[in-house]
Amino acid sequence: MSTDKTYCGFIAIVGRPNVGKSTLLNKLLGQKISITSRKAQTTRHRIVGIHTEGPYQAIYVDTPGLHMEEKRAINRLMNKAASSSIGDVELVIFVVEGTRWTPDDEMVLNKLRDGKAPVILAVNKVDNVQEKVDLLPHLQFLASQMNFLDIVPISAETGMNVDTIAGIVRKHLPEAIHHFPEDYITDRSQRFMASEIIREKLMRFLGAELPYSVTVEIERFVTNERGGYDINGLILVEREGQKKMVIGNKGAKIKTIGIEARKDMQEMFEAPVHLELWVKVKSGWADDERALRSLGYVDDL
């Protein structure tokens, strides 16, 4: 029987919307798990990404961005999910953007000050800072805000200093047995990952035209005799006008979304995928907590 020590722990990635938390998670894992888009609020579930390297297993919790606006049911639930994942972790990675500091950053910081877990401050997108002379004073300002475990300037996009973050994480993992098998990347089901891939393509190809009132339900996910998967996805929007937008002229938009989503699914599932998409109007779902529960938005709260 092996007596080699193993280390395992949970790490929360927190920050206001759109600072690059999902991109950082994907870089730390070495592959795409969390949906990334230039649009704020694209992460709606607490996706757990698992990175196992030798005796070390880091389990990452990718929170929705904590934000001030709490009017709609979906925003309240997203804030609750983010706040709850700050508790029960060994370490927190607080992601901020370049030299920007907003009331939302302040709100996240206040939540972290109340917590017990040590906090790494990841200052993302430093490669995009135009006035490099502003960077050092800003880092000094950040250092004065709380007793951070470390402050690391990074670029999640290019991977700059992401290995530094991973190294700090490894040092702070407690001695424990691994929670997941070595080849696990995420504890989310393939069905969930399929819906996230479709939602990312919607964000990518519709951009600012489409509000957050869009979600994806996987109605069918079965293996077929060809050794692949037959997947049916239902795209839910709030208004008829949004439905037309998703379908596009003569179905061109939904066809592109389907083709691109299928490519990503085949890469992720390592099998052929037959994907069919439909669009349906379900008015007011983002305001209805029961509808959100039925779509799996609160399965982990």
UniProtKB/Swiss-Prot annotation:
Residues that bind GTP: 15-22, 62-66, 124-127
Region spans: G5: 154-156
Subunit note: Monomer.
SUPFAM superfamilies assigned: P-loop containing nucleoside triphosphate hydrolases, Prokaryotic type KH domain (KH-domain type II)
Alphabetical keyword list: Cell inner membrane, Cell membrane, Cytoplasm, GTP-binding, Membrane, Nucleotide-binding, Ribosome biogenesis, RNA-binding, rRNA-binding
Designated name of the protein: GTPase Era
Region (G1) residue spans: 15-22
Family stated for the protein in its record: Belongs to the TRAFAC class TrmE-Era-EngA-EngB-Septin-like GTPase superfamily. Era GTPase family.
GO molecular-function terms, A-Z: GTP binding; GTPase activity; ribosomal small subunit binding; rRNA binding; small ribosomal subunit rRNA binding
Topology in membrane: Peripheral membrane protein
GO biological process: ribosomal small subunit assembly
Main location: cytoplasm
Residues annotated as domain Era-type G: 7-175
GO CC terms in record: cytosol; plasma membrane
Positions of the UniProt region annotated as G4: 124-127
Gene: era
